[in-house]
Amino acid sequence: MTKSELIERIVTHQGLLSSKDVELAIKTMLEQMSQCLATGDRIEIRGFGSFSLHYRAPRVGRNPKTGQSVELEGKFVPHFKPGKELRDRVNEEEHEHP
């Protein structure tokens, strides 16, 4: 599902807000979450999951075109850990719709 599809689905199911209002709310939420992660903060949404940063150590990679070894710097990458309620719900849905 894309962001546009999510916006459409929310507008269709709730009917009180316009498409522009839902789009603004989602864009604002995602921007605030991005800013929190960029400053190293952790985000926890109870029942859904948590977002944090994990450090990837420097390593030697390989250029796929040339096969040449390349030194890759260490970096932080976003990580999502689903909450128990989300995991349980996904597993219920999985059994209902294989």
Curated annotation (Swiss-Prot):
Keywords: DNA recombination, DNA-binding, Transcription, Transcription regulation, Translation regulation
GO MF, one annotated term: structural constituent of chromatin
Subunit structure: Heterodimer of an alpha and a beta chain.
PROSITE patterns: HISTONE_LIKE (PS00045)
Disulfide bond residue pairs: none
Role according to the record: This protein is one of the two subunits of integration host factor, a specific DNA-binding protein that functions in genetic recombination as well as in transcriptional and translational control.
Cellular component GO terms, alphabetical: chromosome; cytosol
Family to which this protein belongs: Belongs to the bacterial histone-like protein family.
Protein name: Integration host factor subunit beta
SUPFAM superfamilies the record matches: IHF-like DNA-binding proteins
Entry superkingdom: Bacteria
Gene Ontology BP, a term: regulation of DNA-templated transcription
